[in-house]
Amino acid sequence: MLSRLLKEHQAKQNERKELQEKRRREAITAATCLTEALVDHLNVGVAQAYMNQRKLDHEVKTLQVQAAQFAKQTGQWIGMVENFNQALKEIGDVENWARSIELDMRTIATALEYVYKGQLQSAPS
């Protein structure tokens, strides 16, 4: 009887150990599946973030190139406007010079006319 109880007890312990081992393996399998699912889920987010970062880097490079082109074009426009402004100033200088010459010529013409009329009046007829 004692040996039978001992055998039953050992059999129950073996069953419990096997059941516990089975549950441990199932728990490990479930934990592994959960871990893989979480990693996959996180990897999707990381992959999306990586793709977004690559797109942003490309856009930044494009923007830098366009900004450099815009700066160059703006510099050219500024140069053209400065040249145009200088040309307008020169035209204004020429116009002022022409007015000055015209005024001097009128003064000379008036003086010559005055002298000529004075000579005509003083000449004996």
Curated annotation (Swiss-Prot):
Superkingdom, natural source: Eukaryota
GO BP terms, alphabetized: aerobic respiration; anterograde axonal transport; anterograde synaptic vesicle transport; endosomal transport; lysosome localization; neuron projection development; peptidyl-lysine acetylation
Segments forming a coiled coil: 1-31
Pfam families in alphabetical order: GCN5L1
Any one cellular-component term (Gene Ontology): BORC complex
Family label: Belongs to the BLOC1S1 family.
The protein's name in its UniProt record: Biogenesis of lysosome-related organelles complex 1 subunit 1
Protein encoded by which gene: Bloc1s1
